[in-house]
Amino acid sequence: QKFLTEYKNHNFYDFQGSTWAPTVVHKEIWKNVNGFSEEFFPGSGSDPDFNMKLWKRGIRIFKGINNFKVYHFGSVVLRDKINKFNKGNKFGSISGKMFLLKWGISIKFFKKFYLLSDIKYEKPLEDPKFSFLFLYKLFLCKVHYLYLKVFYSKLISKSK
């Protein structure tokens, strides 16, 4: 009820790099990338994975629209299952590891350097610009990737 009375007061701007549902895509694009991947636990890593599949197919418009308001319940429906799924995982979420193993970069890296998340939307995205910070963070992703390949063999078989 509170949301319905106050949502008009929450104005920002159309922003770049949306990685959250709801997502609107043409059904042919959805079919082309096979929608959300089932290997990701619902509500945990499936949105960035879907966006990476779109990126790999050449999609470059990832836009959060200010006038489109959605109340997100914060995984209320699946919270217990998600907490159980990630329980005892002090080195990050399992779905974060699965994303890294599948794509070779972390979700955080993808959002920061590819989707440019949370900045004002101005135009379709371009390929990331190489900088020292980009290369350094990419190197850290690759080190973490190798670590997971060596020490998380069960997780690797799960992500395939």
Regions found by a protein language model. Give the residues of each.
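Active-site donor/metal-binding and catalytic loop motifs
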Residues: 41, 63-86, 98
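A short, conserved alpha-helix in the catalytic core of glycosyltransferases
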Residues: 17-34, 40-68
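Non-catalytic, C-terminal membrane-associated alpha-helical segments of glycosyltransferases
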Residues: 88-91, 101, 109-160
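Conserved donor NDP-sugar-binding/catalytic core segment of glycosyltransferases
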Residues: 1-6, 40
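A recurrent flexible, glycine/aromatic-enriched loop bordering the glycosyltransferase active site
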Residues: 4-28, 32, 84-87
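Soluble or luminal CAZymes and related metallo-dependent hydrolases
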Residues: 46, 87-91, 95
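Non-transmembrane alpha-helical segments in soluble domains
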Residues: 51-52, 96-100
